[in-house]
Amino acid sequence: VNRLLGRYMNESLFALTAGIATVEEIDKAVSDYVMPIGPLALRDMNGADIGLAVASYNYNEYGPRFAVPALLGEMVEATVLGQKTGGGFYAYDKETRKRAGVNPALAPLLTKALAKDPTCEVLKEFCNKENLAESLFLSMINEAFLALQERICMPEDLDPALMAGLGMRSGPLELASSMGLPVCLAELERRSTICADKGAFSAAERFRPAPLLKRFVWAGRSSVF
């Protein structure tokens, strides 16, 4: 669960850093799509420091497709950690701890993060506000196929685990089947190629299609189940 969640959480930070959508737009798109809470609100609950530790572990464990978003490091350095410090992606009322809009301290951190990782800009070639939710979950779908390929779990167990653990209304395999496996594969290949052509090789690795997904499509399957 945490491995698949990590891919999607990272992509939300890359999209924010690239300026594809605002904090509130990202969270709303995801909540409207399939999640009970947006990734940035969730990160504020857990803390950017925890997020950075988990992202760093995943990178060391799984490699370049888990590249650590520069924004997390900037937030930790500035002690803009989330609810625990009174501000993260959102600002929080000191009395009630309720959200009080987007945190104004975030803007300069986004500028610094983009300067450290300008390849985030390549996301604008294929990600926009209209396809934002699908774009963020495409990485989770791909990671789900990698997990199946490694025989970490059976297909019939993966979606229930994500739905129980994260409160998703539909799991990644159901999402993939709804989109169509050929569509998922074509979109991942397109994105990986665009990133590589632009010299964003780390980003290209994030979208490299899972071999199992390729095999499913080559076998003529349009859905998982």
Residue ranges and their predicted role:
Residues V1-F225:
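N-terminal glycine-rich phosphate-binding loop for ADP-containing cofactors
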